[in-house]
């Protein structure tokens, strides 16, 4: 009886040791699991390295705004262009900040700072003192600083490209134009103010003048005479029915 019990116990132990071990029953700390985790980590590291190298070889395309800003910053101007006084104009200013108008808007006042390149400041025009008689202009005008002028007509009648921003000594300056134009072509129903409408037809119109401005000629910056609005005048025409 005891011999039979020993035989059954030995057969049971042999069956347990002979059973194959499945990979699903491997403990978490077993060498097989460690090899798999090391392999996946190595593959992940290689993938990150490959993607990083790909990004360096093929960088992401830049936005259009970034390209425009870069192109503006690349337009470098020689400071010698500003040393000749004949190229300076009282209606053209290079500055890093917008210049203000005077309070009465009858003269030009520039910012008194070290950033302004154009030191040729036009003196204020002397105006007669306003009395109680009620003096009025024939035409109403408005004067503004124009900062984003990109195109203009030169003295030869050709359309040229005006430089909006200028890179000088690693600092960006903007080119401003002081322009004057008519506020209204007919300040009064009959046309210009103070004109005898019984004998004359009249209206207000904006006139232009030439100023030196910095323009682009191919890939080079050059001075050119361009037309800008500079005044508002009254045009009168005699009525033909009086003849």
Swiss-Prot record:
UniProt tissue specificity: Expressed by the venom gland.
- Report residues carrying sugar chains: 148, 151
Q: Which UniProt keywords apply?
A: Cleavage on pair of basic residues, Disulfide bond, Glycoprotein, Growth factor, Lipid-binding, Metalloenzyme inhibitor, Metalloprotease inhibitor, Protease inhibitor, Secreted, Signal, Toxin
Subcellular location per the Swiss-Prot or TrEMBL entry:
Secreted
List, alphabetically, the InterPro entries matched. Answer: Cystine-knot_cytokine, Nerve_growth_factor-like, Nerve_growth_factor-rel, Nerve_growth_factor_bsu, Nerve_growth_factor_CS, Venom_nerve_growth_factor
Highest taxon in the source lineage: Eukaryota
- Region named Disordered: 47-67
What is the name of the protein in this document?
A: Venom nerve growth factor 3
Annotated organism of origin: Tropidechis carinatus (Australian rough-scaled snake)
What lineage does UniProt assign to this protein's organism? Eukaryota, Metazoa, Chordata, Craniata, Vertebrata
């Amino acid at each position: 009886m005891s011999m039979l019990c020993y035989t059954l116990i030995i057969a049971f132990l042999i069956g347990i040791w002979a059973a194959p071990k499945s990979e699903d029953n491997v403990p978490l700390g077993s060498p097989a699991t460690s090899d798999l985790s090391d392999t996946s980590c190595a593959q992940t590291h290689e993938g990150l390295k490959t993607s990083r190298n790909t990004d360096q070889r093929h960088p992401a395309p830049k936005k259009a705004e970034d390209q425009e800003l870069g192109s503006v910053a690349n337009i470098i101007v020689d400071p010698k262009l500003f040393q000749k006084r004949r190229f300076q104009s009282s209606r053209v200013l290079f500055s890093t900040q917008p210049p203000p108008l005077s309070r009465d808007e009858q003269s030009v006042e520039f910012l008194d700072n070290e950033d302004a390149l154009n030191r040729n400041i036009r003196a204020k025009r002397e105006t007669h003192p306003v009395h109680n008689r009620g003096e009025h202009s024939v035409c109403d005008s408005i004067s503004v600083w124009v900062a984003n002028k990109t195109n203009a007509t030169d003295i030869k009648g050709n359309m040229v490209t005006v430089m909006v921003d200028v890179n000088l000594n690693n600092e960006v300056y903007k080119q401003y134009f002081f322009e004057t134009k008519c506020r209204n072509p007919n300040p009064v129903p009959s046309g210009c103010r103070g004109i005898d409408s019984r004998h004359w037809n009249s209206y207000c119109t904006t006139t232009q003048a030439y100023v030196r401005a910095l323009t682009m000629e191919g890939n080079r910056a050059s001075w050119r005479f361009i037309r800008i609005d500079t005044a508002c005048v009254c045009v009168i025409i005699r009525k033909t029915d009086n003849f």
